[in-house]
């Protein structure tokens, strides 16, 4: 029965831990970048008043048709 060669296990495990650390760090950097709240920009509304904005208008809905049973 052949003997199991374990000489590369240390290198494999070390590289796996290093890769997982790099992935974890990149995810943490992305999460901190996203959580920064965006700064509000001041929105300037136009001050022109249109003629129909000052008048009150009533909107009439059409009569509903009688229900047939």
Swiss-Prot record:
Disulfide bonds: none annotated. The modification N6-acetyllysine is found at residues 55, 58. Pfam families: ATP-synt_8. The keyword Membrane applies. GO terms for molecular function: proton transmembrane transporter activity. One of its GO terms (cellular component) is proton-transporting ATP synthase complex. It comes from the Eukaryota. Belongs to the ATPase protein 8 family. Component of the ATP synthase complex composed at least of ATP5F1A/subunit alpha, ATP5F1B/subunit beta, ATP5MC1/subunit c (homooctomer), MT-ATP6/subunit a, MT-ATP8/subunit 8, ATP5ME/subunit e, ATP5MF/subunit f, ATP5MG/subunit g, ATP5MK/subunit k, ATP5MJ/subunit j, ATP5F1C/subunit gamma, ATP5F1D/subunit delta, ATP5F1E/subunit epsilon, ATP5PF/subunit F6, ATP5PB/subunit b, ATP5PD/subunit d, ATP5PO/subunit OSCP. This is ATP synthase F(0) complex subunit 8. It comes from Osphranter robustus (Wallaroo). The gene is MT-ATP8.
